Amino acid sequence: MNKDKFHVIIVGGSIAGLTLAHCLHRAGISHVVLEKASEPAPQIGASVGILPNGARVLDQLQLYETIEKYIEPLETATIGYPDGFSFSSSYPKLVNERFGFPIAFLDRQKLLEILYQHYPDKSKIRLAARVISIESSAIDSEVTTEDGTIYKGHLIVGADGVHSRVRSEMWKAAQRIKPGLVTKREQRSMTVEYSCIFGISAPIKGLIVGEQVNAFFDHLTIVTIHGKNGRVYWFLIQKLDRKYIYPECPRFTAKEIGPIASDLKEVKFFKDITFGQLWDSRETASMTVLEENVFDTWYHGRMVLMGDSVHKMTPNIGQGANMAIEDAAVLSSLLSDLLQKQTQPPTNAQIERLLAQYREVRYPRVNSIYKTSRFLVRFQARDGIFNTLFGRYYAPHAGDLPADMASKTIAGGELISWMAYM
């Protein structure tokens, strides 16, 4: 069938949604993006790591060349401990040599700006379009936004983040058909044990461009990445007082961040450089809890999830955005392949088989990387006697272990199957 007769509604215009829009545009598949924010690239103080597996897909989409202008490849990482011991690792450089792309960070806002500005038809990206309900029938679905506009499509993609409206609507639809299809256990499977203050700071003397600092304290981790022109991207991760079940977890206002940060200003994370210097030179900063989970239910009917809406990791592993980019590559590849074979719009059964295949391809890889993420956040926060001793007395003498761990998550990354890759 004509691919432009099959219409995809993407809910969420962040990295996941905009990457999928680029993929669908290249495939000639009709689509629209509904983004609740009134601007395409808001500054929320966040950075984003582009690892080789995500970079390869962005390179296929001819976006990576632009991204390269705003990144500084990492070459060295320094790891420090509370007793003053530290060691350096060239694992970022080794990863670059192995995969042909570096580990690099840039402003999340800048990546969104690139994705938006390089998308050829801005009329397909609807801003200030907050979704309030989704209804599905045997042949299509309807999405209603806050202003009363109704969008009709054949597939609804939830690229709307950890607080996904599409996930909620999908669960409600599943419960109407068969109560218990999405179990209470799954609905309460996302947990929170850590908080994160994250920000971007002006250059600080002593923090060298192209280097990363990881400072491991008891139940506290400080990570800094020194990017283009010395711009410092940083995370301060702390263990909370207890384990919370989402959505019943702490929320932090802008007024609360200052006092929390002030209590940590004297903490030295690299030589004599303190967290206070990071904080005082900040351009922007925010605070959030770190949700963790991979949901079992990825799709129902004509609704499907991708990115943080279905798998949420901590930033320690740097794979969150890259997993969303891979999701876009796989989903668009499967859709393109199906529609090329069709003379009529796909039936519900065909859509269900496609979405089952999408989950079958993605779940094992995502779950494996998620487990590594869970380990890393606890390892770096010296959470428990094993992590404390392993981190201090084994890891510094383990040679290429950091590079091997990073390489394991990067290897096997997905590509857009119908696009050439050199």
From Swiss-Prot:
Taxon lineage: Eukaryota, Fungi, Dikarya, Ascomycota, Pezizomycotina
Bilayer topology annotation: Single-pass membrane protein
The protein's Enzyme Commission number: 1.-.-.-
Function comment: FAD-dependent monooxygenase; part of the gene cluster that mediates the biosynthesis of the indole diterpenes penitrems. The geranylgeranyl diphosphate (GGPP) synthase ptmG catalyzes the first step in penitrem biosynthesis via conversion of farnesyl pyrophosphate and isopentyl pyrophosphate into geranylgeranyl pyrophosphate (GGPP). Condensation of indole-3-glycerol phosphate with GGPP by the prenyl transferase ptmC then forms 3-geranylgeranylindole (3-GGI).
Name of the featured protein: FAD-dependent monooxygenase ptmM
Residue numbers binding FAD: E35, G49, R108, D308, A321
Pathway: Secondary metabolite biosynthesis
Cellular compartment(s): Membrane
Cellular component GO terms, alphabetical: membrane
Species of provenance: Penicillium ochrochloron
Gene Ontology molecular function terms on file: FAD binding; monooxygenase activity
